[in-house]
Amino acid sequence: MLLLFSVILISWVSTVGGEGTLCDFPKIHHGFLYDEEDYNPFSQVPTGEVFYYSCEYNFVSPSKSFWTRITCTEEGWSPTPKCLRMCSFPFVKNGHSESSGLIHLEGDTVQIICNTGYSLQNNEKNISCVERGWSTPPICSFTKGECHVPILEANVDAQPKKESYKVGDVLKFSCRKNLIRVGSDSVQCYQFGWSPNFPTCKGQVRSCGPPPQLSNGEVKEIRKEEYGHNEVVEYDCNPNFIINGPKKIQCVDGEWTTLPTCVEQVKTCGYIPELEYGYVQPSVPPYQHGVSVEVNCRNEYAMIGNNMITCINGIWTELPMCVATHQLKRCKIAGVNIKTLLKLSGKEFNHNSRIRYRCSDIFRYRHSVCINGKWNPEVDCTEKREQFCPPPPQIPNAQNMTTTVNYQDGEKVAVLCKENYLLPEAKEIVCKDGRWQSLPRCVESTAYCGPPPSINNGDTTSFPLSVYPPGSTVTYRCQSFYKLQGSVTVTCRNKQWSEPPRCLDPCVVSEENMNKNNIQLKWRNDGKLYAKTGDAVEFQCKFPHKAMISSPPFRAICQEGKFEYPICE
């Protein structure tokens, strides 16, 4: 009985003493082990045992390697096996973020700045990458806002009259007692209030002299010596310059409204996009801003669209389409109140056919062309009233945009921020449906970055500059066989670059080590002497050697320049 008790006690002590030398079988949420089916998931693992694991789609290990090595130690698994959610960050419509286009990991927090009149869900300012994805969708949605009831000078009338005005509402002005309006004829309600300023009414107004000279630009029409109140002139910039601010100025009671500026455009366009079933005359980039190139379609193909594309601010305008002539669609005439001057044979028209027509209650004639099944312009007798937007608003912290000129639907105005302020994405406002849409914000920018950090065995894809404005990004690449770990781009934030990537060393298959361990490449025709980090190389024993019981796996994973070679005896 005493002997039996001693045996049980010794056995119990041995078990207790061995608890610290065993690891629980690794259970990895959103991950799996290499050759997982070969292991017993209910067994414990002895110290020194090595496993490799990978993560499911949209998840990654902290090292960001495809296969990550973990080792059972007396303290447990090292490193701790886990898979982190990857959250891709889109380009934010109606807002911006320095993280646009980047990948973030679970636990990261990102700041989003929405345009005026827009906000994140629940008015959040930051969103976090969590296991399910983004904590809040990275979408800037329209938010309701209000403007005060305007207090106007005597003899100024505003319509429509309401008890409250919402963001987007437009007020139109007129003068009583046959007085003359001085200032804008309409204003719009924005998140920051009414803009532009309200007008006044006067009995007499002064004329203006010739419009002022514009540096690197000129007036489009012939200049006069005198311009009447409310007369408008329009400017164009010289080649390689783009206009910022309202391109039209107006004579207002003897003074011209604010001039635009012409800014030299240094962004160039690269190779011309390939046109399916078409061609361009070959030439070598870069192409300067404003340069146009003619494109052509092959024989038996018809062009749909403009035959010229232009480099605008580093981007080519839209390519036309080349459609096979036998695939071109016909156009039809619809509408009982349309009278055409043609005998409508079957009421169908071939591509490029032109018609002249008039409507029942309108005497003047209209013209249209059939373009691949669609009339251009549309054959229509509905009277559409031309819509105008109020003068463009004075955006907070933007350069002076004071003007009293209305803009037609589709017209754009480029915005330029004051010094120390940055316009991260949208640089133009667009007049649409009689209102200015999606106003950008000028964000304070107190610090610039120097050249991007250098990395071992890698370089940037572009020539480094001496200074970079906040929000700038630079892309890296590694030398051949080196694997890039981390984000391929770095971003300038608060005078500092985000963490650059690393170029992980490749592995070189060593003949000396293979001979020493009595092994050879499993696939003799593989000829694989180099392997990137995360790549696998398979070995086998040389005849007549056999695998050692404690040998590492014969499918070796390259880990930052090192293989763990299997052993045969």
UniProtKB/Swiss-Prot annotation:
Q: Does the keyword Hydrolase apply?
A: no
In which tissues or organs does this protein occur?
A: Expressed by the liver and secreted in plasma.
The molecular function GO annotations come to: complement component C3b binding; identical protein binding; protein heterodimerization activity
Please give the chief subcellular localization of this protein: secreted
Q: Which residues form the signal peptide?
A: 1-18
Q: One biological process GO term for this chain?
A: negative regulation of protein binding
Looking at the record, the residues that make up the Sushi domain are 23-83, 85-142, 145-203, 206-264, 267-324, 329-383, 387-444, 447-505, 507-569
**Where is it localised?**
Secreted
> What results from changing residue 379 to L?
Found in patients with atypical hemolytic uremic syndrome
Q: Which GO terms describe its cellular component?
A: extracellular region; extracellular space; protein-containing complex
| SMART domains found in the cross-reference section | CCP (SM00032)
- Is Iron tagged as a keyword? no
What are the record keywords, sorted? Disease variant, Disulfide bond, Glycoprotein, Hemolytic uremic syndrome, Repeat, Secreted, Signal, Sushi
Residue spans crossing the bilayer: none
Disulfide bridge partners, by residue number: 23-72, 55-83, 87-129, 114-140, 147-189, 175-201, 208-251, 237-262, 269-311, 297-322, 331-370, 359-381, 389-431, 417-442, 449-492, 478-503, 507-558, 541-568
Its job: Involved in complement regulation. The dimerized forms have avidity for tissue-bound complement fragments and efficiently compete with the physiological complement inhibitor CFH.
How does the annotation summarize its subunit structure? Head-to-tail homodimer and heterodimer with CFHR1 or CFHR2. Binds C3b in vitro.
Q: Which disease is it linked to?
A: Defects in CFHR5 have been found in patients with atypical hemolytic uremic syndrome and may contribute to the disease. Atypical hemolytic uremic syndrome is a complex genetic disease characterized by microangiopathic hemolytic anemia, thrombocytopenia, renal failure and absence of episodes of enterocolitis and diarrhea. In contrast to typical hemolytic uremic syndrome, atypical forms have a poorer prognosis, with higher death rates and frequent progression to end-stage renal disease. CFHR5 deficiency: A progressive disease characterized by glomerulonephritis, hematuria, renal failure, end-stage renal disease, subendothelial and mesangial glomerular C3 deposits, mesangial matrix expansion, increased glomerular cellularity, and segmental capillary wall thickening. Hematuria may become apparent after respiratory infections.
Can you name this protein?
Answer: Complement factor H-related protein 5
Source species of the chain: Homo sapiens (Human)
Q: What gene makes this protein?
A: CFHR5
